[in-house]
Amino acid sequence: MHQEIENYFIMNFVKIIQSQPTNCLRDTFYMAKITLFVRGFRLFPIFAGVFLTKVKSKPMKIQFFAGTLLCCIFASCLVGCSNNDDSIVIAPEADASQFVVLTDVVPDVILEIRYYSTYNFIGRRIPGYDEPIAMLTRQAADSLKKVSDDLIKQGYRLKIFDGYRPQKAVDYFMQWAVDINDTLMKQYFYPELDKAVLVPQEYIAEKSGHTRGSTIDLTLFDMATEKEVDMGCTYDYFGVASHPDVQPGQAIGAYKPITQEHYDNRMILQKAMMDHGFKPYDCEWWHFTLDNEPFPNTYFTFPLTRKSLEAQAGYSSGKF
């Protein structure tokens, strides 16, 4: 049934966009990338083919653009119904049985849960973050305890920005990404980028390693100065400055070049994490995933609250 509806929609939508001027199609083409990028490009060749057949250029009609945006969103929903990945498992909403509250296992960490606050790239508290706590799978928390113990010997504590992230939060990110007019925090988190490219360039995606429970966002806190260590750019900055392998002095746009001190600080964090089984992410200096994560294909949905864990038999302060 979904396939029949999708085919009918495609035929009629192509007829509509074939009658539109090139400038209008250019924006249609771009919006299609945003809404369909993570769906596997199943409709993308259609938009591309029609776009390439147009040669005239006229001002875009606002009414058509608005209608096209709605059509793109509708198409994205239809494709999602028929493009399920059998390797992905969505856990039951109440299933938090393999998770712990991070501070129960690693009491020395400092918490700054950005998505519980309004200081994040959206500017609002994110759904699913019901309490300002961090959770991880037991395996990831145990490994992070070893990282923390090693870094304390070097004069550092770990500062946590995010751990387990409910799927509803990721869904909210995607909804926000489609609304290209909501740019409240642009000057702080993506000043160099048009919001429309955040999904195509994979700064935001439908699925996140955080939702599997063994990914952590964090930085270093200097115990001597009692300040967060300077890594050269802020957490959740969308841009080249966030790449951990940016070299000292390399031009990176709006941010001042990374200094040798910034680079060295990033490497202190990266080495400590890798020494205890975490792998870095090449686009974010703060992001690490347990290499041998226990749920590589399972995405969890329970909210971030102690009640999620207290409902599990035998849970008490992180010990089963």
List each model region and its residues.
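N-terminal hydrophobic alpha-helix used for membrane targeting or insertion
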Residues: 4-7, 12, 22, 72, ...
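Conserved metal-phosphate-binding beta-hairpin within the catalytic cores
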Residues: 288
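Cationic, amphipathic, low-complexity segments that mediate targeting or membrane/lipid association
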Residues: 10, 20, 32-38
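Short, Lys/Arg-enriched alpha-helical microdomains
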Residues: 292
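Extracytoplasmic cell-surface/polysaccharide-interacting catalytic and binding patches
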Residues: 46, 81-163, 170-283, 295-320
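Short hydrophobic targeting helices and cationic amphipathic motifs
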Residues: 3, 8-9, 13, 24-25, ...
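Bacterial Sec-dependent N-terminal signal peptides
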Residues: 37-90
